[in-house]
């Protein structure tokens, strides 16, 4: 059985025991969370599509750890204007393990 979930403005296709790297949205390591289910698929080709969510379907997950993404450099420049700006960014992420898909 698989599900398509939505978290952090992105969609992920997950199955039981998958480990995902998603954007951090609160909670501590070891906490259990429920994720929104957009689509649910099972054995035999059965498919439930939500509008926008599947009623009664839940994906239970556990936060494994908090991490940070790679450093991204932002550089802005306007030619002949002596205008240069350099910035950096690292996204806060968390590893999530899918425990159960019910629905």
Swiss-Prot record:
GO MF, any single term: rRNA binding
Disulfide feature: none
A GO biological-process term: translation
Gene Ontology cellular-component terms listed: cytoplasm; ribonucleoprotein complex; ribosome
Keywords annotated in UniProt: Ribonucleoprotein, Ribosomal protein, RNA-binding, rRNA-binding
Keyword Thylakoid: no
The family this protein is said to belong to: Belongs to the bacterial ribosomal protein bL21 family.
Job description of the protein: This protein binds to 23S rRNA in the presence of protein L20.
Quaternary organization: Part of the 50S ribosomal subunit. Contacts protein L20.
Full protein name: Large ribosomal subunit protein bL21
Organism of derivation: Parvibaculum lavamentivorans (strain DS-1 / DSM 13023 / NCIMB 13966)
Upper taxonomic lineage: Bacteria, Pseudomonadati, Pseudomonadota, Alphaproteobacteria, Hyphomicrobiales
Gene designation per UniProt: rplU
């Amino acid at each position: 059985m698989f599900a398509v979930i939505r978290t952090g403005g992105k969609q992920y296709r997950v199955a039981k025991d998958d480990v995902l790297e998603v954007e951090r949205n609160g909670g501590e390591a070891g906490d259990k969370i429920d994720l929104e289910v957009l689509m649910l698929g099972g054995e035999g080709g059965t498919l439930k599509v939500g509008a926008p969510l599947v009623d009664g379907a839940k994906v239970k997950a556990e936060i494994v750890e908090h991490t940070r993404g790679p450093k991204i450099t932002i550089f802005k420049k306007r030619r002949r204007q002596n205008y240069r700006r350099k910035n950096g960014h690292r996204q806060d992420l968390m590893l999530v393990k899918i425990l159960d898909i019910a629905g």
